[in-house]
């Protein structure tokens, strides 16, 4: 029960200190995001990547700062629960009129759960459900920048309006030919709008901040005509002479889903009201969960909060049971899923086969590397949780036995809260979007037979995509380590994505070598490796026997990606990366580009 009176001075002080902590966090987060504009204008690509990586750490640092302050100034952990009841009510009062209330609620949860015992992790003490609506949040102060701007072109002035749209972002520097680029956009936009008459409400709505990532800046908006809405994004790059160009025009939900993919690095966006940006983006991509949109904007903790709420909602309205995930079992990770839920859950095992020379901390380090690195659309993002409780009755007994056998240190089965509900509590778990394992996807094509044209096309496309995925990883300075088909998955849009991270290394840390010539006949006939191998030595010529046992797969692979079996390919990329070169990886199909000769946004 909430108190009828707010009579604790300490409660208000704690609430205000937490609000101060959040405001400091978002001020620093927003300032770093806003600096992306200058880094883009000055072609500071290494600085952009470094900022993207470092910004991820901001949140946890501010939470730790706030916890230390609360303990030092208020002995927060020793305060009675009636004070903590009041803390939440005071905090809700401070949120009235706040422009990031949903983020501030999540920050409150992060701090409070570091101080209180988990028996108090319910809505009386933390924000299990949001308390403040984010609907129609605006900054009404004079001179405040709106979330989006609306433009009203005529059929004759479309090109001119597009020039004005881009000009309003006030990028420092020159375009090669903005009128030309706007004309190209208008030319491809008109067919997308179809033959319909331009209605009275025809307008172009554009978000007020550009979206920065790596070498690119993206203008994001939509065209409204009558009841029709057309989402679009325009990538702005530096051309070969350093001047700006609009490289492509992306239209529709599928193009934008690729741009905002869970397998890509987070954007830098200067947002005062992030919920308004998310609401606008949801109108462009209605199938994309809000959790993933917050993630894409760099607000990963809010993404985790929304994901967990969605997950609890799904549990309430489903009845199937968690099971061991289909497919080949991993040597390092124990994977399970809920068939009706489009994600998989991964637990690090307690022990591994001898060939896996690793530790739990090393594996966590690999997953952190992926979180902080540019994923170039080829590595799935992960959500990391601790002390996650599931209803015991929703687990198949085989799965419980599997966890007890391979990860007993991570498992607790108890009524820890004393509420009569027995739970499965996992100490540490990663959650990833479910994909079709590539080996299973290929097997489906093989099972259809060699004369099935669609199956043949599926096989060819996935083998080509597999090679493209590896090459994109190489461009991002990532060596996947274990390149077996089972460690890659196929997304809903047919993209091949890597998701097994326990053996990944920076490409620049590896040594790519040729297999030495046999010294004698005994070496030549030996089935064992007879030459000396260092800890990070890689022999690309040896990949073939593990990957290309199927003749049809071998033919397609050798036609498109034979260079992956040549050490020269790997070594040349390594040397160029060491020399400071950043490879170009596009988050959209090459045929969307207006012309060659520009750098990549990625």
Swiss-Prot record:
Keyword Cytoplasm: yes
InterPro entries noted in UniProt: AceK_kinase (IPR046855), AceK_regulatory (IPR046854), Isocitrate_DH_AceK (IPR010452)
BP GO terms, sorted: glucose metabolic process; glyoxylate cycle; tricarboxylic acid cycle
UniProt EC number: 2.7.11.5, 3.1.3.-
Keywords: ATP-binding, Cytoplasm, Glyoxylate bypass, Hydrolase, Kinase, Nucleotide-binding, Protein phosphatase, Serine/threonine-protein kinase, Transferase, Tricarboxylic acid cycle
GO CC terms, sorted: cytoplasm
Family matches, as Pfam families: AceK_kinase, AceK_regulatory
Known catalytic reactions: L-seryl-[isocitrate dehydrogenase] + ATP = O-phospho-L-seryl-[isocitrate dehydrogenase] + ADP + H(+)
UniProt-annotated binding residues for ATP: 325-331, 346
Principal subcellular localisation of the protein: cytoplasm
Cell compartments where the protein resides: Cytoplasm
GO molecular function, one term: phosphoprotein phosphatase activity
Active-site residues from the entry: 381
Family listed: Belongs to the AceK family.
Role: Bifunctional enzyme which can phosphorylate or dephosphorylate isocitrate dehydrogenase (IDH) on a specific serine residue. This is a regulatory mechanism which enables bacteria to bypass the Krebs cycle via the glyoxylate shunt in response to the source of carbon. When bacteria are grown on glucose, IDH is fully active and unphosphorylated, but when grown on acetate or ethanol, the activity of IDH declines drastically concomitant with its phosphorylation.
Protein name as it appears in the record: Isocitrate dehydrogenase kinase/phosphatase
Organism of this sequence: Paracidovorax citrulli (strain AAC00-1)
The gene coding this protein: aceK
């Amino acid at each position: 029960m909430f108190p009828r009176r707010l009579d604790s001075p300490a409660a208000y002080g704690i609430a205000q200190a937490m609000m101060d902590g959040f405001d400091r966090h978002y001020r620093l987060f927003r300032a770093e995001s806003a600096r992306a504009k200058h880094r883009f204008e000055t072609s500071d690509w290494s600085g952009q990547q470094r900022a993207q990586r470092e910004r991820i750490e901001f949140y946890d640092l501010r939470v730790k700062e706030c916890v230390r302050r609360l303990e030092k100034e208020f002995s927060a952990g020793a305060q009675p629960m009636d004070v903590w009841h009041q803390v939440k009510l005071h905090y809700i009062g401070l949120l009235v009129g706040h422009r990031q209330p949903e983020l501030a609620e999540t920050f409150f949860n992060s701090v409070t759960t570091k101080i209180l015992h988990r028996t108090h992790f319910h809505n009386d003490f933390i924000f299990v459900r949001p308390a403040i609506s984010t609907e129609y949040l605006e900054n009404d102060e004079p001179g405040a920048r709106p979330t989006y701007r609306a433009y009203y072109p005529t059929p004759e002035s479309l090109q001119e309006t597009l020039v004005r749209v881009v000009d309003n972002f006030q990028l420092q520097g020159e375009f090669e030919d903005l009128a030309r680029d706007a004309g190209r956009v208008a030319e491809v936009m008109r067919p997308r709008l179809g033959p319909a008459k331009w209605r009275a409400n025809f307008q172009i709505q554009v978000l007020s901040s550009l979206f920065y990532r790596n070498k690119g800046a993206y203008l994001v908006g939509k065209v409204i005509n009558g009841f029709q809405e057309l989402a679009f994004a325009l990538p702005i790059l530096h051309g070969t002479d350093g001047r700006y160009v609009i490289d492509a025009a992306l239209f529709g939900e599928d193009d934008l889903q690729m741009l905002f993919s869970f397998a890509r690095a987070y954007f830098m966006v200067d947002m005062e009201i992030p919920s308004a940006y998310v609401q606008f983006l949801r109108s462009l991509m209605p199938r994309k969960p809000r959790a993933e949109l917050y993630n894409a904007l760099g607000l990963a903790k809010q993404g985790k909060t929304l994901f967990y709420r969605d997950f609890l909602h799904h549990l309430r309205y489903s009845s199937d049971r968690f099971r061991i995930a289909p497919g080949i079992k991993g040597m390092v990770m124990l994977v399970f899923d809920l068939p009706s839920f489009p994600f998989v859950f991964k637990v690090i095992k307690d022990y591994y086969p001898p060939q896996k020379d690793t530790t739990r901390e090393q594996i966590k380090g690999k997953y952190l590397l992926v979180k902080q690195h540019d994923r170039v659309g080829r590595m799935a993002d992960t959500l990391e949780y601790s002390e996650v409780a599931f209803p015991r009755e929703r687990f198949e007994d085989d799965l419980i036995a599997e966890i007890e056998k391979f990860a007993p240190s991570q498992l607790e089965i108890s009524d820890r809260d004393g509420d009569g509900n027995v739970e499965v509590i996992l100490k540490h778990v990663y959650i990833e979007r479910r994909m079709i394992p590539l080996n299973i996807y290929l097997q489906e094509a093989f099972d259809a037979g060699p004369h099935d044209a669609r199956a043949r096309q599926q096989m060819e496309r996935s083998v080509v995509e597999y090679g493209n995925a590896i090459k994109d990883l190489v461009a991002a300075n990532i060596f996947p380590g274990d390149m077996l088909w089972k460690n890659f998955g196929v997304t809903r849009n047919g993209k091949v994505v890597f998701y097994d991270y326990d053996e990944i290394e920076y490409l620049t840390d590896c040594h790519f070598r040729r297999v030495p010539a046999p010294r004698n006949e005994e070496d030549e006939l030996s089935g064992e490796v007879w030459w000396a191998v260092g800890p990070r030595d890689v022999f690309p010529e040896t990949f073939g026997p593990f990957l290309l046992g199927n003749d049809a797969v071998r033919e397609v692979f050798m036609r498109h990606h034979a260079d992956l079996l040549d050490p020269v390919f790997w070594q040349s990329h390594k040397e160029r990366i060491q020399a400071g070169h950043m490879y170009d990886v596009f988050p959209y199909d090459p045929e969307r580009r207006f012309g060659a000769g520009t750098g990549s946004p990625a």
